[in-house]
Each structure stands twice: as C-alpha cells, then as structure tokens.
Amino acid sequence: MTTIQTIGVVGYDKCSEQDTITALEIFRGAAMVLAGKIAPWKLKTPTSTLDVKLVSLVPGNITMQMGTQVVSDAVVGDSDMFDLLYIPGGVGSGAASLDARMLGLIQRHYKAEKIVASNCSGVGILARAGILGKHPVTCVAAVAPGLREEGINVPQPRRMWLGLPEARLWTTTGSYGVNGSTVAMVAHYFGEEIGTICSMMFDTLGGIGQQIYELQGPEFYFHPDLEEKFAAFFQPMLLPPTGNKK
C-alpha cells in the first residue's frame, strides 16, 4: 500500500468552499483517526501521523468563490512536496489553469511520483498541467465537453469518482461528489478500518454504502440539455480556451 504521510490541499483565489473545505475536513478527520484520537473501538490499524495542510501559492488570506476568507497553514515553496497533492475546483479554476506557479506545482509533484487528486473544474487544471494523458477521469459536467474537445478522456456516464492508483491520479465530480470520493480515497490509501470510521463520521456509508470501498464511484445521471446550457455559460470561466482542441 502506498504510504501517505503528508497531504497538501491547495487553496487559490475563488476556489470553491465545498470543494476545498470538505476534502480538507475529511482528510483531517482521517488524521485524527490514524492518531488514535477518534477510536469507536480498539483499532487494529497501528497509529500513525498524517500531516494535512491547506496551502496557498501566495501570502495572505484565500478568498473563496462565495467570499469566505480563510487563512492557509502555509505558502507552498518551490521545494515543498506532499505525498498527496489535492487541487479543488471553483470559479477561479480557469485563472488557476493558466497560472504557471500552479501548473509547475502539479507537474513537480507528478514527476516526483506523488499522488495528484482533484475535483470539479479543478480537473481542468490537471489537464492544463499535462499530467492526465489518456487516463479516464471524471469532473463536473460544466467542463466535461471542453475537456473532451482537448483530448481528455472523460467517459460518459460520469462517475462520482475515478481512482487510478497505478497512474497516481484520483478525480472527482463537482461538489456533490466530494464527500464520497474523499472517504473512498481514505478507505483505499489508509485501509478499510480507517475508511469505515470516516464514512460513519461524515455519514457517507449511509448515503452510498459499500461503494466507498471501490475505485469507481456511482454513475451520475445525464441531463444533456441542461449540461449543454451550463457548459456554454460556465466553460469560458472554468476552462478558458487555449487553442489546444484535438
């Protein structure tokens, strides 16, 4: 099993509150379970330390897409590295997908064989970083058509999450899928016992059941007319054109 001791959730201007904080809270919940601070029974899993940080690319507060101001734990430096790098989505993802600092951070981690995960429109940032190749990914409906036009493999129907451990990639749909996907990541990378406890802490097991132990999440419904309208409205903001259509 891949050893994960550090997780960096990257906050940026106009990232989504749900996409960012939901993942951050679940990872920090897992850290508390791993440390033995939350133990509904005598755990078989040995205690361990998991350091989870909300990091930013620049100093100062992070202003999220609905105006929430948050303080990062650290400004990520050129030599900082995390075993798992997590890129959330949000209306600021389009600008982030053109930010050389963000793209360099993702590329540096993937080149170093670290795990890179993302949700919602943040998957577009991974695409612009050039790390997805032909691997199947999932994302929010609003950027799926644009990613397909750029040659990214977004299967239909979309899955709530797609975990690709061998490729060191884990992608997630929009905000609705973040809870289930993050708990599934915990179950996969830290074991079923830790995943089960987190799934009860965050009520995930009651919502989607045994799927949390799988690498693919539940299928999403397809609403072609609505998805076309939402993509037309949001895509210029979330995935600005670069001229790289395939």
Which residues make up each language-model segment?
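Short N-terminal binding/cap micro-motifs at the start of the first secondary-structure element
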Residues: 15-20, 63
